[in-house]
Regions:
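Basic, polyanion-binding surface patches
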Residues: 2-116, 122-225
């Protein structure tokens, strides 16, 4: 329990339960999951993580994402807790730049995470999810937690309203041409309202994130205003 870890001059202390990260049974948390292929090509993606108990999580994966392929290939992942909206945004809109990555025992993680844990797959169930990617075929994956570390200098706190607006907009972005293909105009109107809220109460990173999301959608859909 007293084991300490230093990554890029940031101090972490070891913990033994997910509750140490303020993650509790039955709750879903927005995280950044880092993985790597067997060829050591790293990837980061926003993934909702459900806390099953003190040492197990459940995640839903779709076949179209690198994260899914990597996890199914080698069964390893790190779940990173961060409040940085740009990390969520960049890892959704494209590939995360190298500067955002650190390493834990040779495995990619996110620099400056508030906390993180390594996990490995113990159970996989194929499941059809209506209106999702790849004709709805994906996997529900249960993972056992191996190592939990918490930053010494940061308290893990709930996300604010502007950050929640960024997360919600990223969900809409990912599903815009699939689940929401028949109601895109309505979703776009709602996203513009989320942007209004973010511009009013958000910090500069949150505001920039919203601009990136909306600009990318407008680039891909010329009819949006």
């Amino acid at each position: 329990m007293n084991q300490e870890l230093i990554i890029n001059n940031k101090h972490y202390k070891k913990a033994d339960k997910l509750e140490s990260l303020n993650m509790f049974k039955g709750q879903l948390y927005e995280t950044i999951v880092t993985t790597q292929s067997n060829e050591h090509v790293k990837n980061a993606a926003p993934i909702g993580v459900i806390c099953k108990d003190s040492n197990h999580i459940v995640i839903h994966l779709d076949n179209c994402v690198h994260t899914h392929l990597n996890i199914m290939e080698n069964g390893e992942l790190i779940v990173n807790i961060t409040k940085d909206p740009l990390i969520f945004t960049y890892s959704t809109l494209g590939e995360l730049d190298e500067e955002y990555f650190g390493q834990f025992n040779g495995f990619p993680m996110i620099n400056d995470s508030l906390g993180f844990f390594k996990a490995h797959v113990v159970k996989t169930i194929e499941k059809k999810r209506e209106n999702d990617y790849n004709d709805g075929i994906g996997n529900v994956v249960t993972c056992e937690v191996e190592d939990i570390y918490i930053s010494d200098n940061n308290e893990i706190v709930p996300l604010n309203r502007a950050m929640n607006a960024v997360i919600e907009s990223l969900v809409y972005y990912c599903r815009f041409d699939h689940k929401y293909k028949d109601i895109q105009k309505e979703i776009w109107t709602h996203m513009k309202e989320l942007n209004r809220v973010c511009q009013k109460v958000g910090n500069e990173s949150e505001k920039e994130s919203m601009k990136l999301i909306l600009d990318k959608l407008k680039k891909n859909h010329a009819y949006l205003e």
